[in-house]
UniProtKB/Swiss-Prot annotation:
This is Small ribosomal subunit protein uS12c. GO terms for biological process: translation. GO terms for cellular component: chloroplast; small ribosomal subunit. PROSITE patterns: RIBOSOMAL_S12. The gene is rps12. Part of the 30S ribosomal subunit. The keyword RNA-binding applies. NCBIfam families: rpsL_bact. Belongs to the universal ribosomal protein uS12 family. It comes from Trieres chinensis (Marine centric diatom). The lineage of its organism: Eukaryota, Sar, Stramenopiles, Ochrophyta, Bacillariophyta.
């Protein structure tokens, strides 16, 4: 326990919380342009081909973002919206592309969990 004199001499320092998505710069989402769309493989126990994109943000930062869902229409120069959220088995991928926003279309034929993949409610046939 410090004395009052010690606290007068030098105040207590606040512990700063480190952000997990620094490229967003305190924004919920950021717009960017795809510079490269490619596939990569995950870390050791898992095996798959994951779709990712290198995105140049409006804040002039370059990040790697994951493309969720089955199938996509993204290519170089596509304008996308990214959000925070890492992919655990892909090192260096800390962002997700939001499906159904800007140039990224929603996942085709998706009926469950539609809001996460930018899919409108299907017309009910009677």
């Amino acid at each position: 326990m410090p004395t009052i004199q010690q606290l007068v001499r030098s105040r207590r320092i606040q512990i700063k919380k480190k952000t997990k998505s620094p490229a967003l710069v305190n924004c919920p989402q950021r717009r960017g342009v795809c510079t490269r769309v490619y596939t990569t493989t995950p870390k050791k126990p898992n095996s798959a081909i994951r779709k990712v994109a290198r995105v140049r943000l409006t804040s002039d930062l370059k990040v790697t973002a994951y493309i969720p869902g089955i199938g996509h229409n993204l290519q170089e120069h596509s304008v996308v919206l990214i959000r925070g959220g890492r992919v655990k088995d892909l090192p260096g991928v800390r962002y997700h592309i939001i499906r159904g926003a800007l140039d990224s279309v929603g996942v085709k034929d998706r009926t469950q969990g539609r809001s996460k993949y930018g899919v409108k409610k299907p017309k009910s046939d009677k």
